[in-house]
């Protein structure tokens, strides 16, 4: 067996704190990453799409979730436009305080 050092990549300090608390409580890396929004990585840097993913997810859940979408309606088109706007917003100027830590 090869020993692979794993690291956790968290989107921000809150995610890091949740991850660490979970791990201290005996949670597995995978479970704690799932709860905290962190990722388990073997590289020394977070994946390049990581900040965009969380930006888009947060934007869509906070701004687009309230749009009700009956099938084949104009409201459905509004939801699509909202999601596209979030994606465009997050494509430019996304900066986060990602935290990487050895596990």
Curated annotation (Swiss-Prot):
Gene Ontology BP annotations: defense response
Proregion residues excised on maturation: 53-103
Example of a GO cellular component annotation carried by this entry: extracellular region
UniProt keyword list: Disulfide bond, Plant defense, Secreted, Signal, Toxin
Pfam families: Thionin
Disulfide-bond pairs as recorded: 9-46, 10-38, 22-32
Compartments it resides in: Secreted
A single MF term (Gene Ontology): toxin activity
Major place of residence: secreted
Physiological role: Thionins are small plant proteins which are toxic to animal cells. They seem to exert their toxic effect at the level of the cell membrane. Their precise function is not known.
Name this polypeptide is given: Viscotoxin-B
């Amino acid at each position: 067996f090869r020993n692979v050092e794993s690291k956790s990549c968290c989107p921000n300090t809150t995610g890091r704190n949740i991850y660490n608390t979970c791990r201290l409580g005996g949670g597995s890396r995978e479970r704690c990453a799932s709860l905290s929004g962190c990722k388990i990585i073997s590289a020394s840097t977070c994946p390049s799409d990581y900040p965009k993913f969380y930006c888009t997810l947060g934007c869509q859940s906070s701004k687009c979730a309230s749009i009700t979408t009956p099938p084949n309606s104009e409201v459905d088109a509004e939801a699509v436009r909202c999601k596209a706007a979030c994606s465009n917003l997050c494509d430019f100027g996304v900066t986060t305080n990602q935290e990487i830590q050895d596990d």
